[in-house]
Amino acid sequence: MITVSNVSVQFGKRVLFNDVNLKFTSGNCYGIIGANGAGKSTFLRTIYGDLDPTTGTIALGPGERLSVLSQDHFKWDAYTVMDTVMMGHTVLWDIMKQREVLYAKEDFTDEDGLKVSELEEKFAELDGWNAESDAAMLLSGLGIKEDKHYTLMGELSGKEKVRVMLAQALYGNPDNLLLDEPTNDLDMETVTWLEEYLSNFEHTVLVVSHDRHFLDSVCTHTVDIDYGKINMFAGNYSFWYESSQLALRQQQNQKAKAEEKKKELEEFIRRFSANVAKSKQTTSRKKMLEKLNVEEIKPSSRKYPGIIFTPEREPGNQILEVSGLSKKTEEGVVLFSDVNFNIEKGDKVVFLSLIHIS
């Protein structure tokens, strides 16, 4: 659990957010959204102590552990991949290092024996005997092959380092997990793995992401940073966006009766909660939506930019025709073969591949 009390952050005369009071509870995943520069990453930095708030306090639950997705990909270059992941649980890692030092001593004293006994008890409590296998499981899930688990971090590619940093953040089942853009540089398969992992995560998660699909998949709540204020809403990104747009339309339609507006909002909540998939996080989200009061739905003050292309003439029905298209790399890897398709006016097409250069 994370409690944010009367927190403000100000740089010079610029106030990023002011008088924030929020509570993030276990079993929920909170998607933090806002325009670029609104203060999403700064809010996370304030929570994990990298930046002191101008006013207010931030507190974790008693004895709870906080884990953060590291953005420094060079700090760990001298360590192996396995050690880097296990260092994510600082308490367990410290115990492991102390054990190694004591067991390596030639002049082992009675006092050392008592200390070792104490360390062994803590080591067992933290499931230290499964430390490496747990780390290996995370690494494999995130696409780091077993033959690289004991490679030095400095020998990995940038994209591989991102995955190891993510494994480090997830390691040891932390009570509170902060993730800033966790899907960057991940392929579709790994993003799907992460979605499933977080959807069944039992503790508190705060995540900043520009990936709407990812936020919809994992989040039970949406935290909106907008014009210096931070507001929390039940539901994932799509629910927040669609409900706020509905509330805005109702606000603009002054002629509609209050009862009609309320009925429309209630029907929207029912439809949305009925479509929520079954997982620990989404079940929690469904319960939140079912309890949601329509008065809690407010229109967003956010304004979205629009890019409008005006063609010089009306295009024809067929925009693009592709026939027999093939491509392979210099190494002979086939990226695609004998591709045939047409794109017609009005079509919206997305290209997906497990091979990123395709």
Model regions and ranges:
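ABC ATP-binding cassette signature C-motif
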Residues: 1-255, 307-358
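Short, structured coil/loop segments at alpha-helix boundaries
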Residues: 90, 109-112, 275, 282, ...
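Short secondary-structure junctions and interdomain/linker hinges
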Residues: 92, 126, 130, 276-279, ...
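Active-site phosphate-binding and catalytic loops of NTP-dependent enzymes
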Residues: 149, 297-304
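Intracellular alpha-helical coupling/juxtamembrane segments of multi-pass membrane proteins
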Residues: 243-296
